[in-house]
Amino acid sequence: MLRGSRSVGVYAVCSCRQFTCVSARLKPFDLGSLKTNNNQSETFNFESMNRFGDSSATSRPIKENRFAQKFEKSAPKKNNYPKRQEKHRNPRKAVRFQFESGSVQAQNAIKAVINEVHSYSKSYKVNYVGSGKGGLEQKHLVDIVNSLDLAVNGIYCVPPTDDKSLPIIKTNKVQEMIKSYTDKLALEKEQELLQKGSIVAQKVMRSRDRAEKKKSATKVSTVSWGISNSDLCNQKATEIQKRISKGEHFLLYLGEKKSFYSARQSASKENAFGLKDTPEVGDIAEEDLAGMSVEERKRLSIFQTVKTMLDDSSCQYEISGDLESRVLFSCQPLERDTKSKDTEQKEAKKSKKASASKQADNSKKAMSEDELDSLYSFKIED
């Protein structure tokens, strides 16, 4: 520690990032203040340098942490945003279709109609025809279906005209609903077989197309100028009545036999015969009849007989042509009142049932009287 005549004493103090250094420089040759005994030299106090010791803790108060309470708060945070109002949504109504009547096929058919309606209206709202009020009535399909008796009635769907409108529901007979359902299934199956390349399906389709063309073709009934009066009044008369009873449009062609083939071939073409409307055909004055030949008189007689047949039946017709070559009747049967016929048939059935019940009652009364007579005779004999 001491060398020569010069000595240096150093005293250092460190506390909390502060360093204090005090150096004392003694005067030269001032050895009086120094202790010559090495054994009696003072030890350095290291505890005084401990900033976090007990002495420092007791000497200087510790400042409180002003952020401690901020993070130790247990109260909920304040939300300055306004509270959202909870919207109470109405629960969706369960759609339940109930089929308590009808066969399994009828139930499958009405399920197909329900699926078709759902493809147009997801809410099952429809315009209903047949409520008795007249016009369209907006209803729910569940109310219509659940009120149906599938053993008697069915429904069918009419697609809407645009995306904003609702489908139309009409009632029909359950047999018609089942038939449309089975036809739809058959068509889907046929398309599936055609895609697979089935030869049988191709033959069936071709035969059906031929049948449809034949059905849609205009029917032609021919009458020859050389027909006898008996054949005209019997055979041709029944043929014409059958055509009228079917209610289909048909042509009645009067001409030579050799022109029948061309008449049938050109019947489907519009104005193929090239005949002008001549409603005055057959209106011949009596003074002109004397100058007519036998053939012309025969043709006039055939024409008048056919015209009388059409007049007596419920049929409208237009005449074109002339007696010299050919005459064409374009016939359109009138629509019959089917309701009146149905009511007549029902009334006839009711009258038959009433008469049968009366006969049964009369027979019972007669039997009871005979039994009483036999009892009385038995008692008299006793």
Swiss-Prot record:
Transit peptide feature range: 1-26
Bias type Basic and acidic residues, positions: 64-75, 334-348
Keywords, sorted A to Z: Mitochondrion, Transit peptide
Subcellular location: Mitochondrion
Keyword Plastid applies: no
Protein name per Swiss-Prot or TrEMBL: Altered inheritance of mitochondria protein 23, mitochondrial
Classification lineage: Eukaryota, Fungi, Dikarya, Ascomycota, Saccharomycotina
GO cellular component entries: mitochondrion
Chain intervals for the UniProt region annotation (Disordered): 64-91, 334-370
InterPro entries: AIM23
This protein's record includes keyword Transit peptide: yes
Principal cellular location given in the protein's record: mitochondrion
This protein's encoding gene: AIM23
Taxonomic source organism: Meyerozyma guilliermondii (strain ATCC 6260 / CBS 566 / DSM 6381 / JCM 1539 / NBRC 10279 / NRRL Y-324) (Yeast)
A matching Pfam family: mIF3
Family: Belongs to the AIM23 family.
